[in-house]
């Protein structure tokens, strides 16, 4: 599924928050997002099952739905990332891509935990390749 920049921005906002957000909260989190744009994007993402209504809350005197991402949305974003990487894989090696990803994380303890996670994954992948 192809997502336009506004849809990607709304998805990013929803994934970065640990709670469901109203459309107004999404507008306030985004750069240059308007209420009408966010509502149109949410309708499309709801139809595609990339977001879901997770509740209803009072927003002043009005009831507002709160939205959160679905598991499917993470899969779609992961696939978009991989498709983008595939377009540049002849230029950027996997090692350079991974090194660049680690360089973006300034939290050294988080970086160390992720390195250990990748080491475990690499050991598993190596074992699978050797067994074939």
PLM regions with names:
Residues 10, 40-48:
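Basic amphipathic alpha-helical segments that dock to polyanions
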Residues 1-13, 124, 128:
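Short alpha-helical segments that sit at the start of domains
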Residues 74-128:
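Amphipathic alpha-helical dimerization/coiled-coil segments
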Residues 14-19:
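Short helix-capping/hinge SLiMs at alpha-helix to coil transitions
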Residues 33-34, 38:
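Short coil turns linking two alpha-helices in DNA-binding domains
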Residues 20-29:
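Short acidic, hydrophobic short linear motifs in intrinsically disordered regions
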Residues 3-6, 22, 56-78:
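Short, cationic-aromatic polyanion-contact patches
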Residues 46-57:
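A short, conserved structural fragment
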